Amino acid sequence: AKAAVNWEKSNLKQVLDRVDANGDRGKVTFFLENWFTGAADRWNADLDNYYLQLAAYMKSRGYRYDQWIVHCFDEVLNDKFLNGAKNIKRLDPQIRIFSDPPPATAEQLRPFLPYLDCFCLGSWFLQEDANNGNKAVELLRSTGKPLWIYECDSQPRHPLNNYRRMALNSLQRGWDGFTFWSLTGLQFRHASITPPEGVVNYGMTYLDENGVRYPSRRWALWELGIDDYALVAALRQKGIDVSGEIRTMCGTKDAAALDEAMEAFKKEKLKAFIPGEK
């Protein structure tokens, strides 16, 4: 018999316990990232054991399959990933698998579609695909599976205009979400990683000498984007179409102008949720 995974000493247990302690169960989807799957020379019995026990553990904690997803290959579409995804689905077809693919053609993506459950596309993927007629994005949209947009780094030198606008970019496309990969910055997550010379990879928060973390202006704007996204989603649930307004705001050129436009939009559209207002 295969050895049992000691979940009692795992980071996963700590995270699940913390979510329960905060009263946040049901409010989050767990993104279960591991690198040992991709690092293995080939698929093996230990991986079989891990994924079967992972599914059993999440079930024992009261979580449905739609409340967690596995990320085990990063920015690749290679044979090892395809084989790994097939094996995970062989073990348990309900385990969901996440992908943040590199720029790819529809033909490169097609073999993966039966095995992957959520796609998160970087701006570089979208730019290259736009040059090729948007065929890859059209293929992914045809699956009906969740589509997100993301950026990797968040640096102080990047235009502030990028941060609130990301929500509008996702909304305009009719997609399901948006995120930054590095919310805290690589050197804060992994002390062994040194950014290339000239790159200040701080994410969107800062850590002081006492271990206290502070948000940046970039974080504040990204957080406003989350509010924008939630408002538009609520309006759509009411059957209120704001596609034209979203397109107009996406064309706004700088952060200050976008902020002014969005605040006016919110002030007007929030009336839809006030009894007696129109």
Region annotations inferred by a language model:
Residues 13-16, 82-86, 109-110, 133-138, ...:
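Short amphipathic alpha-helical segments and helix-helix/interface helices
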Residues 1-4, 12-43, 47-104, 176, ...:
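Catalytic domains of carbohydrate-active enzymes that cleave complex glycans
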